[in-house]
Amino acid sequence: MAKAKFERTKPHVNIGTIGHVDHGKTSLTAAITIVLAKTGGAQATAYDQIDAAPEEKERGITISTAHVEYETQNRHYAHVDCPGHADYVKNMITGAAQMDGAILVVSAADGPMPQTREHILLAKQVGVPAMVVFLNKIDMVDDPDLLELVEMEVRELLSKYGFPGDEIPIIKGSALQALEGKPEGEKAINELMDAVDSYIPQPVRATDKPFLMPIEDVFSISGRGTVVTGRVESGIIKVGEEIEIVGLKDTQKTTCTGVEMFRKLLDEGQAGDNVGILLRGTKREEVERGQVLAKPGSIKPHDKFEAEVYVLSKEEGGRHTPFTNDYRPQFYFRTTDVTGTIKLSADKQMVMPGDNATFTVELIKPIAMQEGLKFSIREGGRTVGAGVVTKINN
């Protein structure tokens, strides 16, 4: 069956369902597509199609993720749903599925459970900006007082982890009733999508952020100077603009005197472009892979940070043994490896393969970084973990 082509005229938002196992994340995902299909905003996707999520590799880690897309009156959404808890942990830490917002699914019959807490905490750690709650399975609860109690618990839990628990929209409904085509089931799905439309903020587009380009290669072109190449991560660079070279050494200022793409000269390079940038007065040996070009003052180099990390299991090709305090692997940021030392918190003796953990890292050289930056942990050239910078300590 040919895929319906979506008009890209509406603003795009990436979203995902999170929450405890068996609380109805996949049923809800299916219900959204089935309800929106009635107005032509989606291709109806059955539970089984979503549940049989294909495996993907992201930074050497295998993750099962299902992707569906749909649109409301106002927006176009790409929605991710994961079959297993471990897939969520990996997904959120590696940023395999970037989430601009999340739908937290909580079963009204059970209330918040351990993974509900863990997913809220992870969402906070990795910087998911906002979430909306779907209180599912209300057809299994007869007592309105119980519903109210569960709602209060969810709000308290959200507040505890730094989300605005009092403001977050909580929609009550039953994904099952929506799948069965019952009017009250469909009404709840429409209410949920209205809440997602209005409450999840529109993400800032990459081109509107400050200019940043990780340096992949450096050449010197006789008579013209030094050219650095890479893919522009964010923002726009125009010929004649002043830029900084950040990371590994002291920050240097320089000027962009040319932007080249596919051997053609351009006036500017923007997010997503693979470009060569000619730098005025910069010597070949002053720049290296692993540094970044950036808008002056927009990013600083740091060597100490806190991170949320997923450690690969033995089956995933990771370590066979746990690591302890003062473990010294390589940290791969953007385009280069830097050695660093891991400091575990006082209450943690070791980290087991297959676990996720929070710890502090001290690098031997500073890297241009901001909160939310993703990295891999490598040992002898193989990936043993993936992480995200949650806090910079300097």
From Swiss-Prot:
The keyword Cell membrane does not apply. Belongs to the TRAFAC class translation factor GTPase superfamily. Classic translation factor GTPase family. EF-Tu/EF-1A subfamily. Residues 10-204 form the tr-type G domain. It comes from Rickettsia conorii (strain ATCC VR-613 / Malish 7). Signal peptide: none annotated. SUPFAM superfamilies: EF-Tu/eEF-1alpha/eIF2-gamma C-terminal domain, P-loop containing nucleoside triphosphate hydrolases, Translation proteins. GTP binds at residues 19-26, 81-85, 136-139. It is found in: Cytoplasm. GTP hydrolase that promotes the GTP-dependent binding of aminoacyl-tRNA to the A-site of ribosomes during protein biosynthesis. This is Elongation factor Tu. Keywords: Cytoplasm, Elongation factor, GTP-binding, Hydrolase, Magnesium, Metal-binding, Nucleotide-binding, Protein biosynthesis. Residues 174-176 are annotated as: G5. It comes from the Bacteria. CDD domains: EF_Tu, EFTU_II, EFTU_III. Residues 19-26 are annotated as: G1. The gene is tuf. One of its GO terms (molecular function) is guanosine tetraphosphate binding. Residues 81-84 are annotated as: G3.
